Amino acid sequence: MTTLHILGFPRVGAKRELKFAQERYWRKELAEQDLLDLAKALREKNWLHQAQADADFVTVGDFTFYDHILDLQVATGAIPARFGFDSQTLSLDQYFQLARGNKEQFAIEMTKWFDTNYHYLVPEFQKNTTFKANPTHYVNQIREAKAAGHQVKPVIVGPLTFLWLGKEKGEAFNRFDLLKQLVPIYFEILTALAAEGVEWIQIDEPALALDLPQEWLAAYQDVYAQLAKVNAKLLLATYFGSVAEHADLLKALPVDGLHLDLVRAPEQLSAFEDYPKVLSAGVIDGRNIWRANLNRVLDVLEPLKAKFNQRLWIAPSCSLLHTPYDLAVETQLQQNNPELYRWLAFTLQKVAELQVLKQALNAGRDAVTEQLNDSQTAADARANSNVIHKAEVAQRLANLPANADKRQSPFAERIKLQNKWLNLPLLPTTNIGSFPQTLEIRHARAAFKKGELSLADYEAAMKKEIEFVVRKQEELDLDVLVHGEGERNDMVEYFGELLDGFAFTKFGWVQSYGSRCVKPPVIYGDVTRPEPMTVRWSQYAQSLTDKVMKGMLTGPVTILQWSFVRNDIPRSTVCKQIGVALSDEVLDLEKAGIKVIQIDEPAIREGLPLKRADWDAYLQWAGEAFRLSYMGVKDDTQIHTHMCYSEFNDILPAIAGLDADVITIETSRSDMELLTAFADFKYPNDIGPGVYDIHSPRVPTAGEIEHLLRKALKVIPKERLWVNPDCGLKTRGWKETIEQLQVMVEVTKKLRAELAE
């Protein structure tokens, strides 16, 4: 018989029940016991869904109140010493303080979990870190599930991935040196799990899909030789990429089974067809929301079944944490877009797909004819749908002129033309894009969406807000103005709602971090722009002032990265389609007299593949898609872009290759360190390093901004330097925003006068 198991389940519930309970608990509106009871009910529901789908085990240890890597920091005693907490007796309140900070200590840093849109809390390792086992989190969940009558498989992230994901703090050392102390602690934790009578323990080592240094790879053999002494079988799970280059290493490891991601890297299967133990085939996509073509999946699985027999397990490619909970609650989508609805599968539907596959492998395809026919019909409909495939989009991409993604003239010539009409002072000041969104604005948007506010009243509310934002900027004496983006709920969703080829769910939430969830748009078809999206707002804003108004768009790579993307054509093609659609908007803005246009790309870096060897291909198509978004603009139109993150050094040639006339970047928190990379690289175009951190309500002193600007002037010629905040101001309040910008403008004017002398 084929074994069915799940690597992990979403934690937040079908309608974000956990999120709302957590937030009520933090506001002291919910008792701790009530939060614990709700969490238990959610776990029981998750286990029941797995059991009802004929899973051979239910997975435990995957549920967390905030983050599974934070749970591991507690379980190994590796919580940051700076908090002064005892990991053995940690309270729920203290646990949340680690994640959210308190009056004395800032929160543990967050970063992206591999190349997903989930964030984990980065372990802080010090030279003198001492580990201490506390398996309570896992043991309690095992007991809970067993008490409910389930067969149980606990999951824990492995020691090498855990160490790799952390950062060294304090005195310089290599965190790899902590491995020999960490492994006995893992042994202690696994021994406690085995003592609960579990047959299998799943140990996740996704770091194997990265370019790990040789000494880290070499350590796997010894680490797992020690862990294999535990009185339970070990399933080593890899995902997010191919581990084929480590096939010899993995075959020799003393574990009892291996999980492979055959969705992200189907080609790696050939390297493991002689694997002598349990092979878990990750055949259902754990990171996207499309139904699988089950006949095609069986074409892969049936030969494996013949070869591996009882040793074949089936599973999703990775944890289902990255997919929404249940398609069945999307009644609105089912009514409005029944065709698209039939092509989708959320977590519960994916579990059901695995159940069908298990039945087919155990009893033959005839046992599930109806389900297989239904799957095939949906796949065929999707392949041939004219809702998805638009001949004119494919033609337009195929017939782009040879240098469609190149400006007419090089930057040195363009900037002269731009400066001539812009007539800006030295060190021009601007804002990144958004201004604070008041409750009033949010209410107006929501009421309009629900049909409670007429179009005329909605437009009046937005125009009133735009005028307010423009007047405030004039009072502050900023040089290049923005309209404030009051009409936008989210920088991707706003454009997705106005572009063809996108759809939206009502409950398609996935966890981003802690209680924060995001609802990505669904890109299901060829992308086009049926009509202008931003022109009237920017045009209205420009009509209110003689100062230069900047148009604001979200770039193609960011729209791609923050959406669920169709899987029937390459991501690169989808990205170029978005770029071409945006170019229509850019040209319409230009025609309307908006000749400074910003195309934001905060997500270009996070799209980088996990393996370095794949970077160039990605950066090439991502860069092309970005340049296509402004194709055809005149030389005297100034294109800006904005990026927010701290690591640029390794992709600077690609950033320069975007050929934006002005790039604004987040630099204040790193004390302008980032700029040295731009200077060493001799970055050729204009640059606006952020001079204060917008993530805090604190108003910077004149001295702080002056210090940063003087640092910037040391490495960037004054003629090419812009002055701006780090990021958009949407999440700030108006009071601190005005005060922050006042300081920024005053310091700029002081330095301007000095430079003029």
Curated annotation (Swiss-Prot):
Catalyzed reactions per annotation: 5-methyltetrahydropteroyltri-L-glutamate + L-homocysteine = tetrahydropteroyltri-L-glutamate + L-methionine
GO molecular function, one term: 5-methyltetrahydropteroyltriglutamate-homocysteine S-methyltransferase activity
Family matches, as SUPFAM superfamilies: UROD/MetE-like
Active site as annotated: 695
Pfam families named in the record: Meth_synt_1, Meth_synt_2
Sites where the protein binds 5-methyltetrahydropteroyltri-L-glutamate: 16-19, 112, 516-517, 562, 606
Chain positions recorded as Zn(2+) binding sites: 642, 644, 666, 727
Pathway involvement of the protein, from the record: Amino-acid biosynthesis; L-methionine biosynthesis via de novo pathway; L-methionine from L-homocysteine (MetE route): step 1/1
Binding site for L-methionine: 432-434, 485, 600
Cofactor binding mode and count: Binds 1 zinc ion per subunit.
CDD domains linked to this entry: CIMS_C_terminal_like (cd03311), CIMS_N_terminal_like (cd03312)
Listed InterPro entries: Cbl-indep_Met_Synth_N, Cobalamin-indep_Met_synthase, Met_Synth_C/arc, UROD/MetE-like_sf
EC number(s) recorded for this UniProt protein: 2.1.1.14
Reported cofactor(s): Zn(2+)
Biological process (GO), any one: methionine biosynthetic process
Keyword Amino-acid biosynthesis among record annotations: yes
Binding site for L-homocysteine: 432-434, 485, 600
Keywords, comma-separated and alphabetical: Amino-acid biosynthesis, Metal-binding, Methionine biosynthesis, Methyltransferase, Repeat, Transferase, Zinc
Record function comment: Catalyzes the transfer of a methyl group from 5-methyltetrahydrofolate to homocysteine resulting in methionine formation.
Family, similarity comment: Belongs to the vitamin-B12 independent methionine synthase family.
Protein name from the UniProt record: 5-methyltetrahydropteroyltriglutamate--homocysteine methyltransferase
Species per Swiss-Prot/TrEMBL record: Actinobacillus pleuropneumoniae serotype 5b (strain L20)
Highest classification ranks of the organism: Bacteria, Pseudomonadati, Pseudomonadota, Gammaproteobacteria, Pasteurellales
